[in-house]
Amino acid sequence: VSQEHPHLEQGLRAGFVNRTYPALNEYLPQFLVNDAAKHKKVLSSILSGLRSCDEFWFSVAFVTTSGVATLIQTLVALEAVGIRGKILVSQYLYFTQPEALRRLLQFRNLELRIAVDGDFHSKGYLFQRKGNLYDLIIGSSNLTAAALSTNTEWNLKVSATNE
């Protein structure tokens, strides 16, 4: 990892071993929350990941029309340049809105799947960048406007390679 991605190794070392180790912010693990007072939203990190990725995967328990609406302009832009994505959702507690799924199905570059067995309740957003680098956001945020912008949510963003 150090020869191909020295900045990634430095970021992991600074984030998990020694805070004083020099590293670029882009590669540091980040705790992501919605904080109106600091003008921070989980949504900003999701949008940033989408705008800089070559491919992406979402795995969320719930999707709502409000959640899709927060991403719609970026999804349109990704479709225009052929960036592919896969989204896995659940029907757990029947919270996912059918209209949100219909809206996502309109994108030719997206593959949408629904987990129908068990209590599928994961929440993860994975973005592949150039050079086989990946950014993963994992935590409590579903694909709803409230979860991505206002709810009390805890998420961790980490970067890694595919090795």
Model-flagged regions — what are they?
Residues V1-E163:
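PLD/PLD-like phosphodiesterase catalytic module centered on the HKD motif
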